[in-house]
């Protein structure tokens, strides 16, 4: 909503349409004006989890609020930290926040299978136009390893 509250009317419609499918409230949560009111509203809607960086640029920076949300949520909803979660900080985010589920991309740059490459044309951005970011099993394993 324009005032930074959760759009309860449209979320209720979404929840109805989802039926028995678990719904994660995405990082729009990080743009709410009152995260504790938003937490209670989202719980009342029946969402299964909230994906959040703790209203900060990264989950590590938002770990303080994440910890408060995890405590207030209890067993009613899962608080899932996301944004900047990597193998070098996931254990610290877990320790600081008390969260048990995490959202991360575990991506690496991979070359394209394109054989022909036109050196005269770019796709409008810096960097290699023939590279793509892909999630790799190696990075997933490396990211979750510190939690074991």
Regions found by a protein language model. Name each.
Residues 5-27, 63-87, 125-148:
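Alpha-helix-loop-beta-strand connector modules within alpha/beta enzyme cores
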Residues 6, 34-37, 61-63, 91-92, ...:
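Short, well-ordered secondary-structure micro-motifs
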Residues 10, 14, 20-61:
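Histidine/lysine/aspartate-rich catalytic loop segments that bind and position anionic ligands
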Residues 30, 80, 99-135, 139:
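Active-site pocket-lining/capping segments in soluble small-molecule metabolic enzymes
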Residues 1-4, 47-60, 97-119:
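Glycine-rich phosphate-binding active-site loops on the catalytic face of alpha/beta enzymes
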Residues 9, 31-45, 69-79, 85-104:
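Catalytic cores of alpha/beta
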